[in-house]
């Protein structure tokens, strides 16, 4: 009997050169000498999809070696990056032209640079995307985390990606140990939702079935930012996993604290995946109340429970035969209730994962935490990158 392939995310580093307003990971980097090695990568199971992420993955100078090993394990690989290290990205893609690249761009130029805190970050990312397309790379696209500050740029950025023939991935604010953040929250929900609504209608009017299902994902983002239960079950830790820079295998990156199923540095995959610790984490997942709506958990669920998004798509494509706006955010009861005064902003805020009094667990090892006693995360990573460039 063939082994069931999984969906995996490999967090190759917690080092990051960006200073994003919605993510404090840059303040809590991993030590390079502790980061996941090829010996551990080789122990991963067969996967139908692998996302390589960070931190900023291209800070690792051995990323090519990691991709080379993962290609033996996975049918498809997509790397999430801020696009800053253009030369490294282009060099890697020359060797591996069949991988995917998603560059985080948080809006048009001014908005992006303010949110990501990278000098000339927009132009760097945009230039990298254009050069990848000129190289003939097919699986290339934008990734945007939608929030109050950049929501008005959502549709314009989508149209830019569409003109360039690129993928366009969306997310919204989440809180977890992975983001080293507990205070993220959408303040003007109707405004943000209206921009999502406009995007959804553009996606539904397209001729691409892939975009129709992305419309459903964005419908779920509106539902999430209003603090409602997930539209689809979460099966993280059952057919999907994350592995962090220390070799710790986790169900996802959305938990308040780091939940560890086992450590692949010291265990075999089969022993780890079937361990009592893994079963204990799965029990927590079954009772998790965070209701995250991130592509890492939703995409597998959309495939597994295809009839739910499929029916939604069919319904709205039928509506699109008669109107240019087949979708309305007010299809969601909570949106109508908020509009009509039956639920308050304060009540919705309490439904979110925002916790102003939370002490965030950053998921670092003791050694990585120790280095922060003497220098800030920014100083550590800046010095690391400067040293790389000198070499």
Language-model segments: which ranges?
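Flexible mid-to-C-terminal extensions adjoining Fe-S/redox cofactors in radical SAM and related proteins
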Residues: 2-4, 253-391
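Alpha-helix N-cap/helix-start and coil->helix boundary motif
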Residues: 17, 64, 86, 108-109, ...
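Short aromatic-enriched loop/helix-cap "lid" or pocket-rim segments at secondary-structure transitions
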Residues: 22, 63, 89-92, 115, ...
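Radical SAM enzyme [4Fe-4S]-AdoMet core and its adjacent flexible, acidic
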Residues: 34, 69, 73, 99-106, ...
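Generic structural signal for small/hydrophobic residues in well-ordered secondary structure
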Residues: 12, 89, 103, 142, ...
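Conserved alpha-helical substructure of the radical SAM core
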Residues: 1-98, 177, 350, 361-362
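Residues immediately within or flanking Cys/His clusters that coordinate Zn2+
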Residues: 13, 17, 231, 285, ...
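Residues that scaffold the ATP/ADP-binding catalytic core of kinase and kinase-like folds
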Residues: 19, 23, 60, 111, ...
């Amino acid at each position: 009997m063939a082994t069931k392939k999984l969906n995996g995310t490999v967090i190759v580093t917690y080092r990051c050169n960006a200073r994003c307003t919605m993510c404090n990971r840059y303040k809590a980097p991993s030590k390079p000498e502790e980061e996941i090695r090829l010996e551990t990568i080789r122990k991963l199971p067969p996967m139908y999809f692998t996302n390589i992420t960070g931190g900023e993955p291209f800070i690792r100078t051995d990323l090519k070696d990691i991709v080379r090993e993962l290609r033996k394990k996975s049918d498809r690989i997509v790397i999430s990056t801020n696009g800053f290290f253009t030369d490294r990205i282009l060099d890697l893609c020359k060797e591996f032209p069949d991988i995917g690249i998603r560059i985080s761009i948080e809006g048009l130029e001014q908005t992006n640079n303010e949110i990501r805190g990278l000098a000339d970050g927009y132009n760097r990312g945009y230039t990298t995307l254009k050069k990848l397309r000129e190289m003939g790379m097919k699986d290339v696209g934008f990734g945007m985390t939608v929030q109050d500050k950049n929501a008005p740029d959502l549709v314009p950025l989508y149209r830019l990606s569409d003109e360039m023939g690129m993928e366009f991935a969306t997310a919204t604010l989440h809180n977890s140990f992975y983001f080293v953040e507990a205070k993220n929250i959408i303040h003007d929900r109707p405004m943000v939702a209206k921009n999502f609504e406009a995007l959804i209608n553009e996606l539904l009017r397209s001729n691409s079935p892939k975009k129709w299902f992305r419309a459903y994902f964005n419908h779920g983002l509106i539902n999430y930012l209003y603090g409602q239960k997930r539209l689809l079950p979460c099966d993280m830790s059952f057919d999907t996993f994350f592995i962090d820079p220390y070799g710790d295998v986790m169900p996802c990156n959305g938990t308040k604290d780091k939940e560890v199923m086992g450590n692949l540095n010291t265990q075999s995959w089969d022993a780890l995946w079937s361990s009592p610790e893994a079963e204990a984490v799965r029990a927590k997942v079954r009772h998790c109340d965070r209701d995250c709506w991130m592509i890492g958990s939703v995409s597998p669920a959309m495939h597994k429970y295809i009839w739910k998004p499929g029916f939604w798509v069919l319904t709205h494509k039928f509506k699109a035969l008669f109107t240019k706006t087949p979708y309305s955010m007010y299809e969601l009861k909570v949106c109508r209730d908020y509009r009509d005064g039956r639920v308050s902003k304060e009540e919705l805020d309490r439904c979110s994962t925002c916790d102003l009094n939370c002490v965030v667990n950053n998921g670092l090892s003791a050694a990585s935490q120790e280095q922060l006693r003497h220098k800030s995360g920014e100083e550590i990573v800046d010095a690391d990158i400067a040293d790389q460039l000198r070499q």
